[in-house]
Curated annotation (Swiss-Prot):
The gene is ycf24. It comes from Galdieria sulphuraria. This is Iron-sulfur cluster assembly SufBD family protein ycf24. Keywords: Chloroplast, Plastid. Belongs to the iron-sulfur cluster assembly SufBD family. GO terms for biological process: iron-sulfur cluster assembly. GO terms for cellular component: chloroplast. Its main location: plastid. InterPro entries: Fe-S_cluster_assembly_SufBD, SUF_FeS_clus_asmbl_SufBD_core, SUF_FeS_clus_asmbl_SufBD_sf. It is found in: Plastid, Chloroplast.
Amino acid sequence: NSEVKYSTVQNWYSGDENGKGGIYNFVTKRGLCAESNSKISWTQVETGSAITWKYPSCILAGNNSKGEFYSVALTNHYQQADTGSKMIHIGKNSRSKIISKGISTGNSINSYRGKVKVSLNASRARNYSQCDSLLIGNSSEANTFPYIEVYNRSSIIEHEASISKINEEKLFYFMQRGISIEEAISLIVSGFCKEVFTELPLEFALEADKLLGLKLEGSVG
């Protein structure tokens, strides 16, 4: 019945507006749910570094074990983020959940890359994955690369992906009510990320929300 919750907010130097300089952020995080009813939950907010590769993994070996992954990745200027999760189901009745929110602006590229694998003996395993991308401006890019392997017919795998854009109509709605464009974008992004922020400790969630607002300054216009 053990539980581990690991939360990070990353804001390494991302380079200048022309994409020069910046930290390369390559991270390895793995967790093993070895016994029954164990749980691992990864929560991360990525706003910095020039290039980020990050794929926290859960090996769900115990029966009734659970793995969760909640992520927000914001890229601006010439940043590149390739993030996601791996959920490996081995135990019976194991459960996993993946919630990924990607925001792309400037000339940046933001990609979700995840793997869900259900082994032959993982009867009645279940996974739910939701990958949402938000584009700001006309030069940014968002991608989703799901990899799903299922070897047990009693398992249930659900995957949803969406890409949307902050259009002029939405911004005009806010401006009619006396809200500036930058503040409007910040509010829209904050609502977009709410599902992940609620999984962070309160002080982390407040700082992450402010950090995204600062990173988005000047993203339009």
